[in-house]
A protein has these predicted regions:
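N-terminal [4Fe-4S]-dependent radical SAM core
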Residues: 1-53, 74
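Short, acidic/polar
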Residues: 64-69, 165-169
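Leucine-rich repeat
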Residues: 65, 90-92
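Long, low-complexity regulatory tails in eukaryotic proteins
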Residues: 237-262
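Conserved small/polar residues in nucleotide/adenosyl-binding loops
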Residues: 268-273
Length: 273
């Protein structure tokens, strides 16, 4: 109850409802039905969510990337985790053009400006993930002033897990009024540290220890994928279009989304598995 009350106080209700419907119904119900059917009839492991690292330097992002979303929805994918090293504001028209999808836009805190927040106000299908660094509190304040849906995330290494395990990272997220607090292991992170972090994440979540919901962006996505259609597939696309398997330390594969259809890329990935 404290989490719900806090979220409704600081974030727009319509954004919470629309993002939640896209995630829960389009992504995990309607989309999941399509994912399971394709697995059953074509033996293709379709992910329920995938990561897309976008090169925002292109003048016409719509013509370059919209086909990926169109193909994804045909396969039952309605949840996307987007990232760019450039200006995230340039990705907003793509998000607007796919109102039936739940879009998670990962941003560096320095990229969260007043102009960005104002441009994002009209979008109800997006959650903004702010990177955890020295400027995160300022970025969260900007987003909160515009009543946008946001949370924070951090990538951790073997030497950077203490804040997560001690709970100080989650307590910071509480102070920032985040409904979610996410972690993601660096590809070089050891299996033992990853497991300890995930145990801490699940333990805190089950105990409702904080006024925020801890999430592990790898293990929880994998877990949901295994519920929808096992074995779970966790993949992403780099700015050049090459596909990589997040479950294999981000190793690139031979196939490219700009040279082949998404269905073919996933078919080859399923065959490789």
């Amino acid at each position: 109850y404290p989490l719900i009350e806090d979220t409704l106080r600081h974030m727009d209700k319509e954004k919470l409802i629309e993002f939640g419907m896209n995630l829960g119904y389009n992504g995990c119900t309607q989309g999941a039905h399509i994912v399971r059917k394709i697995k059953r009839t074509e033996n293709i492991n379709v992910p329920w969510l995938f990561f897309l690292n976008i090169d925002s330097s292109y003048a016409d992002l719509h013509s370059r990337y919209q086909a990926i979303f169109d193909q994804g929805k045909e396969l039952g994918i309605y949840v996307y985790c987007l990232y760019t090293d450039g200006d995230p504001e340039k990705l907003l028209p793509l998000i607007e053009h796919n109102p039936d999808c739940a879009m998670i836009l990962l941003c560096n805190s320095a990229a969260v400006t007043e102009d960005f927040a104002k441009a994002a106000e009209s979008l109800n299908n997006m959650l903004i993930g702010v990177a955890y660094d020295d400027n995160t509190d300022t970025a969260c304040l900007v987003l909160r002033d515009h009543r946008l849906l946001y949370s924070i995330y951090r990538m951790y290494t073997d030497t950077e897990s203490d804040e997560i395990l001690s709970g100080s990272y989650a307590r910071f997220a509480e102070e920032m009024h985040c409904p979610f607090v996410a972690v993601l292991a660096d590809p070089g992170c050891s299996a033992s540290v990853r497991e300890n972090v995930y145990k801490a994440v699940v333990g805190a979540r089950v105990a409702q220890k904080y006024r925020t919901i801890p999430i592990d962006l790898f293990y929880d996505i994998e877990r949901i994928g295994n519920i929808i259609s096992p074995p779970s597939s966790i993949i992403g696309f780099k700015p050049d279009g090459s596909i990589y398997n997040i479950g294999s330390d981000g190793n690139p594969l031979e196939h490219n989304i700009f040279n082949e259809s998404l269905r073919d890329c996933l078919l080859y990935t399923s065959d490789a598995a």
